[in-house]
C-alpha cells in the first residue's frame, strides 16, 4: 500500500492571513482578543488560537465595550460592521480578500439598481456576509440565494433584464457551472463577474483531488465537517467513483477503510494545517503504508497583506 499526496493541499493565502492576524493581534495587543465566528473552519486551528488568548463569539453583543474584535475570513454583513463602528470597537478585518471582492461586486450591483443572484449554501457565514452587502439604502435591487440547479426553475426575480450573479468562493466548480448555465438559459441578459468568484485555491484543490481519484482506490480529505471547501473535495472524489472520507485528524481513520486498498490518496482542505496531514501519514504508516509520493500540481505563490497596524507593530 502506498500513499499519494495531492498538490496543492492545505492552507491557502486567505487562511494564512486570517490566522496570522489573530496571532499578531494577541502578541501586540495582549489577550483576550475576540473573534467573531471561527476565524477559519478548522477545530485544531481554533483550539490553538483559544490557547493563545482568542475568544470566539458568534455575535458582537458577546464582545465587551472597548475590546478588540476580529472578523473571520468568511466576511461579515454591513450591519455587523456598522454595529462595531457604533460601539467604538477596535476591529481587525480578516475577511479573505477574494471574499471582499465578491462583497464589492454585490455592492456595485446594488448601487446600480440590479437584482443579484448569489449562488451558495444557506447558513454558511460567507453567504450571510455576502447577502448582507445588499441594503435598501444602497439601491433598488434585490438579492436572491440559489443553492442548486433545481431552484433556478422556480426563481422569480423582479428584474430579469437587469440581473447579475455572483458566487460563494468555496463551491464545487462543476456544480456552480451547471447552475450558471441554467441561469443564463433562463435570463440571457444576466451579467456575471469579470473573473470567476470561486477562488484559485478552491479550484486548484479540486483539480488536485481529481488527479488523486484517477490514481487511487481511497481518498482521505483532512478537514473539519463545517468546512465547505473540504466537504466539496470529498464529494468530488466520491462523484468520480472513489471511496472517500472527510476526517478531522488521524484518530478518525477506520482501519477497515484501507483493507484491500493499494493506493491511498491524501489531501487537505484550505483551512487544514500540514501538521494534521503529517499525523494522518504517520497513522497510515502504522497501518501498513510503505511509501509516500507527491503528485505534481499547480504552484501557489499568492500572499495577502496583513492590516497595516499589525505590519507596523511587527517592526516597531
Curated annotation (Swiss-Prot):
Alphabetical list of HAMAP family matching this protein: IspH
Molecular function GO labels: 4 iron, 4 sulfur cluster binding; 4-hydroxy-3-methylbut-2-enyl diphosphate reductase activity; metal ion binding
Family, per entry: Belongs to the IspH family.
Biological role: Catalyzes the conversion of 1-hydroxy-2-methyl-2-(E)-butenyl 4-diphosphate (HMBPP) into a mixture of isopentenyl diphosphate (IPP) and dimethylallyl diphosphate (DMAPP). Acts in the terminal step of the DOXP/MEP pathway for isoprenoid precursor biosynthesis.
Pfam families assigned: LYTB
Gene name as annotated: ispH
CDD domains noted in UniProt: lytB_ispH
Pathway, per record: Isoprenoid biosynthesis; dimethylallyl diphosphate biosynthesis; dimethylallyl diphosphate from (2E)-4-hydroxy-3-methylbutenyl diphosphate: step 1/1; Isoprenoid biosynthesis; isopentenyl diphosphate biosynthesis via DXP pathway; isopentenyl diphosphate from 1-deoxy-D-xylulose 5-phosphate: step 6/6
Protein name (Swiss-Prot/TrEMBL): 4-hydroxy-3-methylbut-2-enyl diphosphate reductase
